Swiss-Prot record:
Top-level taxon of the source organism: Eukaryota
InterPro entries associated with the record: Kinesin-like_fam, Kinesin_motor_CS, Kinesin_motor_dom, Kinesin_motor_dom_sf, P-loop_NTPase
Family: Belongs to the TRAFAC class myosin-kinesin ATPase superfamily. Kinesin family. Kinesin II subfamily.
Ranges annotated as biased composition (Acidic residues): 416-428
GO cellular component: axon cytoplasm; cytoplasm; kinesin complex; microtubule; microtubule associated complex
UniProt keyword annotation of Ribonucleoprotein present: no
Organism: Drosophila melanogaster (Fruit fly)
Gene Ontology molecular function, alphabetical: ATP binding; ATP hydrolysis activity; cytoskeletal motor activity; microtubule binding; microtubule motor activity
A biological process term (GO) from this entry: sensory perception of smell
Expression by tissue: Expressed primarily in the central nervous system and in a subset of the peripheral nervous system during embryogenesis.
Coiled-coil blocks: 351-385, 426-582
Name assigned to this protein: Kinesin-like protein Klp68D
Localization (cell): Cytoplasm, Cytoskeleton
The gene coding this protein: Klp68D
Primary localisation category: cytoplasm
Length: 784
């Protein structure tokens, strides 16, 4: 057997820096898109590795966007073609000792899970992951003089938390970093010995994976799944160890809430998915622009992909897109990120003689067990031989003792007994000692046999985990199949070189045409300049459209980030509301002061060692639930107290007891409030005018005095004309000057009082006469 046939894989030991290989795959039109008659906007040219995207709304052929990749596959491409042309060389490099990574990227519902896993029970539709299993074990079975150790793990990133899909009830995992790269401690790994074992592990993990329904996909993946394969290989001749690691990643698709119709829990999942994918896009952009800072720590996904993007790994990015105009914006975004990822350079290094190789530990443990078992088996055989000898000697002693006893009996008959010692008792004691030694040796042998059986079982278990190559070659695959695989690899390499050459020719086409063309006349030169001008103008329009698209995408990203920020703010307010209403103030202050942010795990933690001692004196915090009021049995918020006071049906759940509270019913009122009488507007105006102060008051008094004088004179004249005799007339006449004198001396008030005294009351009755002593008699009148 040649050296080449004994080596695992066919790749070279030293490789220069290489870029991430980007492949685009377009799915066929779905039944829903056909029923809605949505036009196709994607044209794929597999021979050139070109994807052309056209906006149907614009309709201008010059506005078509063209993207070039390492390979492009349309809807007619099969799973077998994709695997043999793209994935097969990468898996061969992993079997050589390199790190490899394959991840599917794109919008939800574009066929990422179909590309990675395929359809169960259908060999033609089998995805990349199960085909990888077959290639690995085919290589192990036909490689001689090598020992292999294959371990697999399966995890998912759900809501920015790492979960072990092989142990669904385990605690959340953490991401750590060391000199060799990023790893996940406490991740459960299963040792596999065949293709069937690896398929069973994948099926168990898929059952535990989170899947949901959306308007875009009935079986939408709600988490990022990572299937890890670690292959350790040891050359039995040179005793060199190589380790190859392969990460197969099925990313969740980016979503827009308006299209997926996500709500409640699905909306939270979509926000976390979009956040992780946007972080991945930022990492790709930073690596493409050779930025000094790459934001790997923005999400758990980018941290796990740190070695695959810009690290020690060979990486393939499969961008899945949809052909419909309905997904134009998402398709354009995916193609742009994929185009940027082409310029990312990795530094793959072969992992030779690693310090953490389990294969080396297993070999050392096997040698130690063999050294323990070897001497014990030799001692066991020696003890068995001695035990057999003792069993053989025992009957001889019995015959000898019988002969001796016979001779002693004869001697006792012939001679008197001189000694009282009994030889038979001494022989029986020696026999008992021999039997005890034999029983003891048998117990030791049985105990050593049990220990040897345990060591042998452990040795068989360790040797069973190590798979030796070069067996069952004729039973699994024939020589023709091996040659066919080699030819397929050569064809894939040749096709890849043809695509690269075709792309280089297209880039140099413009320069070669300018060199070859010779201007014969001015008209041809003008025509040539016009064509150049039209091309430059088309490039200008394309760049301008690209700039506008970038602005719109940036605005869309800002709006999505604002929505995510609003959701986070609402969640924060809800948490703060709970803390303010249900957590005691001293506990809240203590938690705020002791909270620290762990950048490694990206979460807040509390230092239990630095927490203050509680006032109880026993050094322990009370486990009793805090109360908001001493008279209440449980913490109650202000809103619950207000609702408990009302008797509405919705407030029954806030009541601690099944008692309806009613208010006191008061009797009806028998009195009314006093209301002031209404005053007419005209009277109100007169009163307001009368209440005014100023020079008008004097005029009013003068006019009133004049009116009283005129009325008084009329009354006096009437009384004078209606007199009954001379006495009366004289009396009346004599009273006139008296009245005038009174008027002149006492003024208007006295005259008014006399006038009022002569008036009749409103009832028509005369007023009662006053007694004479009421007023003093006049002492005479004085003429003017």
């Amino acid at each position: 057997m040649s050296a080449k046939s004994r080596r695992p894989g066919t790749g070279s030991s030293q490789t220069p820096n290489e870029c991430v290989q980007v492949v685009v795959r377009c799915r066929p039109m779905s039944n829903r898109e056909r029923s809605e008659r949505s036009p196709e906007v994607v044209n794929v040219y597999p021979n050139r590795g070109v994807v052309e995207l056209q906006n149907v709304v614009d309709g201008n052929k010059e506005q078509r966007k063209v993207f070039t990749y390492d390979a492009a596959y349309d809807a007619s491409a099969t799973q077998t073609t994709l695997y043999h042309e793209v994935v097969f060389p990468l898996v061969s490099s992993v079997l050589e000792g390199f790190n490899g990574c394959i991840f599917a990227y794109g919008q939800t519902g574009t066929g990422k899970t179909f590309t990675m896993e395929g359809v169960r029970g259908n060999d033609e539709l089998m995805g990349i992951i199960p085909r990888t299993f077959e290639q690995i074990w085919l290589h192990i079975n036909r490689t001689e003089n090598f020992q292999f150790l294959v371990d697999v793990s399966y995890l998912e990133i759900y809501m920015e938390e790492l979960r072990d899909l092989l142990k669904p009830n385990s605690k959340h995992l953490e991401v750590r970093e060391r000199g060799s790269g990023v790893y996940v401690p406490n991740l459960h790994a299963i040792n596999c010995k065949s293709v069937e074992d690896m398929i069973k592990v994948m099926q168990v993990g898929n059952k535990n994976r989170t899947v949901g329904f959306t308007n875009m996909n009935e079986h939408s993946s709600r988490s990022h799944a990572i299937f890890m394969i670690k292959i350790e290989m040891c050359d039995t001749e040179t005793n060199t160890i190589k380790v190859g690691k392969l990460n197969l990643i099925d990313l969740a698709g980016s979503e827009r809430q308006s299209k997926t119709g996500a709500s409640a829990e699905r909306l939270k999942e979509a926000s976390k998915i979009n956040l992780a994918l946007s972080s991945l896009g930022n990492v790709i952009s930073a690596l493409a622009e050779s930025s000094p800072h790459v934001p790997y720590r923005d999400s758990k996904l980018t941290r796990l992909l740190q070695d695959s993007l810009g690290g020690n790994s060979k990486t393939i990015m499969i961008a899945n897109i949809g052909p419909s105009n309905y997904n134009y914006n998402e398709t354009l975004t995916t193609l742009r990120y994929a185009s940027r990822a082409k310029s990312i350079q990795n530094q793959p290094i072969k992992n030779e003689d690693p310090q953490d190789a389990k294969l080396k530990e297993y070999q050392e443990e096997i040698e130690r067990l063999k050294r323990l078992i070897g001497p014990q088996q030799q001692q066991r055989s020696e003890k068995q031989v001695t035990a057999k000898k003792q069993r053989v000697k025992k009957p001889k002693k019995e015959t000898v003792t019988k002969e001796m006893s016979d001779s002693l009996q004869v001697s006792t008959i012939e001679q008197p007994v001189e000694d009282d010692s009994d030889p038979e008792g001494a022989e029986s004691e020696s026999d008992k000692e021999n039997e005890a030694e034999v029983a003891k040796s048998n117990e030791e042998l049985e105990r050593e046999r049990v220990e040897n059986s345990k060591l042998a079982a452990k040795l068989a278990e360790l040797e069973g985990q190590l798979v030796r190559g070069g067996k069952n070659l004729l039973d699994t695959y024939s020589e023709r199949q091996i040659e066919l695989e080699k030819k397929l690899v050569e064809i894939a390499e040749r096709k890849k070189r043809e695509i690269e050459i075709q792309q280089q020719l297209e880039l140099q086409e413009e320069t070669t045409l300018e060199i070859r063309e010779r201007n014969v006349s001015l008209e041809q030169e003008v025509e040539l300049k016009k064509r150049k001008l039209s091309k430059c103008y088309a490039k200008y329009l394309a760049l301008q459209q690209e700039l506008n698209d970038c602005k719109s995408d940036h605005n869309q990203d800002l709006r999505e980030l604002e929505m995510a920020q609003n959701e986070l703010v609402k969640e924060l307010k809800r948490q703060l509301l709970i803390i303010d209403n249900f957590v005691p103030i001293e506990v809240k202050q203590r938690l705020y002061t002791q909270a620290k942010y762990d950048e490694e795990q990206e979460e807040w933690k509390f230092s239990s060692m630095s927490l203050p001692t509680p006032p109880g004196g026993d050094g322990k915090f009370s486990s009793k639930r805090p109360v908001s009021h001493p008279q209440r049995r449980r913490p109650t918020s202000e809103y619950a107290l207000q609702e408990a006071k009302s008797n509405s049906p919705s407030s029954l759940r806030f009541k601690s007891e099944n008692i309806v509270n009613y208010e006191l019913e008061m009797p009806c009122r028998t009195t009314q409030e006093y209301r002031t009488p209404k005053v007419s507007a005209s009277l109100q105006a007169v009163l307001a005018q009368a209440m005014q102060t100023g020079g008008d008051d004097i005029d009013i008094v003068d006019s009133h005095t004049n009116s009283l004088r005129s009325r008084l004179e009329n009354i006096i004249n009437a009384n004078a004309n209606g007199g009954a005799g001379p006495g009366a007339g004289v009396a009346v006449g004599s009273s006139i000057p008296n009245v005038r004198n009174i008027k002149s001396s006492r003024g208007l008030p006295s005259a008014a009082s006399n006038l009022d005294s002569n008036r009749r009351p409103p009832t028509g009755r005369l007023p009662a006469k006053k007694p004479a002593s009421a007023y003093p008699k006049a002492r005479g009148l004085v003429n003017k």
